[in-house]
Amino acid sequence: MRNACRLTMMGFILCGALALAQNPPAPTRSPILEQVAKTYGVDSWDKVEAIRYTWNGEIVGLFKVAHKWEWEPKTGKVSYDGPDKDGKPVKVSYDSSQLSGQSDQVKNQVEPSFVNDNYWTLFPFHGYWDKSASAIDQGKFNLPVGPGMAELVPVKYPAGGGYTPGDVWDLYVGKDNRVVYFVYNRGGAKPPSRVFATWTGYKKAGPILFSTEHRGTADGKPLHIFISDVAVKLTGSDKWIDAQ
């Protein structure tokens, strides 16, 4: 994992694999990933013109930060408003499909943070879209913390390539096909190596469902991630639909 992905701009990086090994064998993928993605609105994704949100993260004693994002999935345009790695304010817009022509700050700090924050915000979609990741339904297990049971679906990324190769996201999926809890296991040596977090605070913006509240621990330290100011703009409209 590149150094920029460790605690980029004081952020908390749990990046999915983007640059994947060439010609890997087809992974085993449970149909539950599609069911989960449909619950979150993946069938209406083509209607989404833009998404905006603020990713707020805190690990007690390590950092507290807020990143404001606006993303146009169809064009690849990303706009960021927040601190750089030294805490200085940054405001920048760029084309995420043309990273080679961007500044080092965008390539090494802003884009890795965007990937991290976007995975927290939309992981049910990314887990479905990332076809190189394996996913096998393990059946019902007790939740890692608290009462209750859910379907355990580990989403494992290939060992080669990406920001954090070999990462595993253990999703705990409820009867309604919503993620209720997850455990993140880093494939590399950089901390944090293990994260436990709830998936609660569900809100809907247009056709897209978001989990906005995540509490747990990162290597034993208290963790709080929450997604605020979520809104979606649909194709053909200038109106932002706030999550409720």
Predicted regions and their residues:
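Bacterial N-terminal signal peptides that target proteins for export
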Residues: M1-M10
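Hydrophobic h-region of N-terminal signal peptides that target proteins for export
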Residues: F12-A21
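Gly/Pro-enriched, hydrophobic low-complexity segments
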Residues: A21, G146-A243
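Flexible, processing/modification-adjacent segments and terminal tails
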Residues: N23-E34, Y94-D167, G187-S193, A243-Q244
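N-terminal mature ectodomain segment of secretory-pathway/periplasmic proteins
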Residues: P31-Q105, A133-N142
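Short amphipathic beta-strand/extended segments with alternating polar/hydrophobic composition
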Residues: A66-W71, P89-S97, V106-N116, V195-T198, ...
